Amino acid sequence: MSLVGIRPAKLEDRSLIRSISERTWPSTYGHIISKEQIDFMLDWMYSDESLAGQFEKGHQFFIAQLNGNDIGFCSVSKSDEGQGDHKLNKLYILPNIQKSGAGTALLFKAIEIAKAAGSTSLFLQVNKHNNAYEFYLKKGFIKESEFKFDIGNGYYMDDYVMRLSF
């Protein structure tokens, strides 16, 4: 069995982060939202400019590696609401590598970052129909609320807000 490695991402990793997103989103969201909405959201969240802005705002990205291959990433940041918590903004693993322990390793890294900063919880948003919802429940997250967020062009994010307290 191979161990999953985690490394900090750099600004120069934007194309890698975009590439992993482009390979994970169709299988993650293709049964939930249209291809047009997937394309819109990928451009909105994973363009070079958008990712550069996220790095600039203090989002910390980490890359998961297995056998020397980059297989996923996560992003964690201090909460914008100033509630003394952190937000897991993104966590994606290539479809053929899921259930390898990489998602858990990235989640543990995000928790480590939040705890080291003095936060008492980690929260996230997950689409109501995303299989990752069950993953987060198994890891101890609690569904806190749900909301439908207008992201423009007639598209919505229909999410649960989940929180892990520590």
Which role fits each region the language model picked out?
Residues 123-127, 137, 142-159:
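Conserved catalytic-core motifs of GNAT/GCN5-like acyltransferases
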Residues 92, 128-130:
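Active-site-proximal loop/turn and secondary-structure-junction residues that shape catalytic pockets
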